[in-house]
């Protein structure tokens, strides 16, 4: 009678401690994002596991104002600037 009691005790212990089986296909897990530590700061943003420079965020791609063409030394006296040249101004100097 003892062997039957021991077998029954083991069987009942297994039933009490049994855990439900989990099918991995049914269980959906959200993937953890790859976060860089420390995170990308300033002019950089994260792509995968790397920090990439953002030229638009930091103003590297700005429309630059064209510099005026200034003659050095500037036109003086009876001359005025037209483009990159000094042109004689006959009205300014009283030649007319």
Swiss-Prot record:
Compartment(s): Secreted; Nematocyst
Assigned protein family: Belongs to the sea anemone BBH family.
Main location: secreted
Site (Cleavage): 29-30, 64-65
Gene: HAUTX3
Keywords: Cleavage on pair of basic residues, Disulfide bond, Hydroxylation, Nematocyst, Neurotoxin, Repeat, Secreted, Signal, Toxin
Annotated disulfide bonds: 40-51, 43-58, 75-86, 78-93
Leader sequence residues: 1-18
Gene Ontology cellular-component terms listed: extracellular region; nematocyst
Keyword check for Cell wall biogenesis/degradation: no
Propeptide residues, chain positions: 19-29, 30-33, 62-64, 65-68
Recorded superkingdom: Eukaryota
Protein name as catalogued: U-stichotoxin-Hau2b
The protein's role, per its UniProt record: Neurotoxin that paralyzes freshwater crabs at high concentration.
